[in-house]
Amino acid sequence: MISSLLKKVFGSRNDRLLKQYRQTVARINALEPAMQALSDEALAAKTQEFRDRLGKGEKLDDLLPEAFAVCREASRRVLGMRHFDVQLIGGMSLHQGKIAEMRTGEGKTLVGTLPVYLNALSGDGVHVVTVNDYLASRDAGIMAPLYNFLGLSVGVNLSQMAHDDKQAAYACDITYGTNNEFGFDYLRDNMVFSVDEKVQRKLAFAVVDEVDSILIDEARTPLIISGPADDNIDMYQRMNAVPPLLKRQETEEGEGDYWVDEKAHSVLLSEAGHEHSEEILTRLGLLKEGDSLYSATNITLMHHLMAALRAYSLFHKDQHYVVQDGEVVIVDEFTGRLMAGRRWSDGLHQAVEAKEGVEINRENQTLASITFQNYFRLYGKLSGMTGTADTEAYEFQSIYNLETVVIPTNKPMIRKDSQDKVYRSAKEKYDAILADIKDCHERGQPVLVGTTSIENSELVANLLSQAKLPHNVLNAKEHAREADIVVQAGRPGMITVATNMAGRGTDIVLGGNPEPEIKAVRADDSLSDADKNARIEAIRAEWKQRHAAVLEAGGLHIVGTERHESRRIDNQLRGRSGRQGDPGSSRFYLCLEDPLLRIFASDRVAAIMDRLKMPEGEAIEHPWVTRSIENAQRKVEGRNFDIRKQLLEYDDVANDQRKVIYQQRNEILVEEDVSDVVINMREGVISDLVDLHLPPESLEEQWDLAGLEKTLASDFLLEVPVAEWIKAEPNLDIEQIRQRIVDMAAAAYQAKVDQAGDGVMRQFERSLVLQMLDNHWREHLAAMDHLRQGIHLRGYAQKNPKQEYKREAFELFADMLERIKRSVVQVLMTVQIRGQEDVDAVEPHALPDFEMQHAEPGSALGDDEDNPLSPEALASQGLRINRNDACPCGSGKKYKQCHGRLA
């Protein structure tokens, strides 16, 4: 009440920001006549003038009005597009490191040119981040003439690009690329063996297109670079026979062997299921007679069994993945795109391959990983654009410290969004959808049908084919034709069926887009200039007629075949219609069999239908129902936010360690001579050994002289007669003994250096330290994974899992650093280097074979199959937690407000 009153008096934060921006817009507009008066050469020369002024101490903010005016005028001349005032406002918010929410069709790509130009003047490089290679190439191609006119270079960073091409792309003033590629390049740069092999420069400023898709939807999926580990391929094939022999429980407490929890996306084996599984595995010869699945020797069996069960019951063909050319290819659940080359981790991908009967690839070992949250927080300044950010403004603020600014539209939005229609069965729903599409088609109104999976898009396409309605299908299988289909989706009577429209990046122009036809005419050398002009005029006249017909029919009509679990993605689908003040309409059709309703709201809605005695084919259409569904979506969004936040809290621990290791690694890469590092390591290892065998402030009788001599001889080839020294000099103290051993080790090592040559040994030392650092870091990553997977069990011992994780992770890290030092010193003291050829033989010249993995959302949290914090799992273990008790996950919340909320 009070806050709404204050807003009325003072305006919201958004209103106040827009007011500030409009004052700057007035200054930019005042400069426009002066800019228009400049010649092309004088306008382009402004870039160097700005750079000179920056060199003399001026700030980017001081240059902003003039730089924006220059960019706008250059855009008008080169691209034929002049920035609207609201686009200038969007550009200012991006320059300030904020998120600009701009409706579809408001020209986000053009808005990005303003802050990109301004920040590229500093010479540190600007990264423009998009969701796929197609958009990166397209946007770079469209905008390159503008930037080149202004004297800036543009590069595109694509996957599968040659190393030299990548370096060239990053060396440009502006680099376009995908979020995955930027992240993977960062990880790869921290695996190279020479500074010259690095591709990235300083991470100064990034503009993220479709920022909600990248920083929120994909923030649950860590980027992982992994290499093959030794694994038993045969095990996956044999284990694939088990799930069909087990019985799925109809209800959580019902009879059967396992329960599929769709909310938690997990599979839980019942007590009977454990026993039945053991019988089957014994029969298959995988388990010894009388042996238990839980014995220490059978840990891998349990891992394989749960992977097979999850592949069998949770991951479905044409929804979560497709089989293409004998390979299982993941489908991105947020964009519906195929993610070639990405693999699920934890053996799940191999289990799916076994299920589909395709060739199984080896399980992988993590070589490097990072979450998008921690990668993008490495940038000095981060900003983003999207059509739908306001629903997630709190998350952007709390995790990335990014403020969301809602930019007003250039023209008022007049799209009509109708209430949801809810039917009892899928058949009734699809009948209604078909009737709606048919009506639009007959009236010449274009329709975009949005689906949440490839499976659903093909189902709708089949229904349209049966009804003899012409249509285009836009899903991950039609990747190549994607842009062409979207461009023409606004033609009269056109029907387009599409999976999630997030990140499609192409506006649907009412009447279809005439530009491809015009481009083809211009490229036709067989036509004279007069013929070309005549044809182009005819194409434009024809488009005007089509455009008018579509406006008359009501603009683009959006049909949603079901609600997504996120309101934002529903809003993205709606946002395809009503661009730049065009008319349009939208409606979602739902039924009680839809996943969202089935899991969260079916009982309530079914009860209403029963009470009203609704006949078949009748739909509920009421604001209360729509509100109820949005509340269900809010619940899912809140849960997903909790998962991402928890993932970040855990990854922050790993991130601190990652920064230390990568910084140390970079220092070694830069140095040609790491002998000082080696000396410190050697002295540290010897000092620790002396402390272990001759504890400080201990009596001489407690010293283990024999143990010290034996360790020095066996591990470091040092024959050190400590006992004889003490016999000869009874007053010798520990510090003197320590110094003598250090001096002996230094002398022994110097003899090796003299024999092999100083340059050869310096090269070998550097190579060895890098290899040991990498090897132990990989082992540490695996240890951290295992620690994370079981850490939530500490909640049952009344300990805080996060605190325990931090404490143990620190101990693991400290232990790893000690092992690195000892390994390096041990090898250097024992190795025999004869000359350069020995160093060349052991020095790595290239990165190991690896692949980029797309880990399953939430897997980095250690959400293993038997999640003991789910209400179902707690009940199956006979544990009853009072709703007001502290939640065992260690969050500090009451159980009813934490994991109990999901019951």
Swiss-Prot record:
Domain of life: Bacteria
Subcellular locations according to the entry: Cell inner membrane; Cytoplasm
Enzyme class: translocase
GO BP annotations listed: intracellular protein transmembrane transport; protein import; protein targeting; protein transport by the Sec complex
Catalytic activity field: ATP + H2O + cellular proteinSide 1 = ADP + phosphate + cellular proteinSide 2
Cellular component, GO annotation: cell envelope Sec protein transport complex; cytosol; plasma membrane
Stored InterPro entries: Helicase_ATP-bd (IPR014001), P-loop_NTPase (IPR027417), SEC_C_motif (IPR004027), SecA (IPR000185), SecA_CS (IPR020937), SecA_DEAD (IPR011115), SecA_motor_DEAD (IPR014018), SecA_preprotein_X-link_dom (IPR011130)
Residues binding ATP, per UniProt: 87, 105-109, 507
Cofactor: Zn(2+)
Keyword vocabulary terms for this entry: ATP-binding, Cell inner membrane, Cell membrane, Cytoplasm, Membrane, Metal-binding, Nucleotide-binding, Protein transport, Translocase, Translocation, Transport, Zinc
Classification via SMART domains: SecA_DEAD, SecA_PP_bind
Chain positions recorded as Zn(2+) binding sites: 887, 889, 898-899
Xref: PROSITE patterns: SECA, SECA_MOTOR_DEAD
Cofactor details (free text): May bind 1 zinc ion per subunit.
Similarity comment: family membership: Belongs to the SecA family.
Protein name: Protein translocase subunit SecA
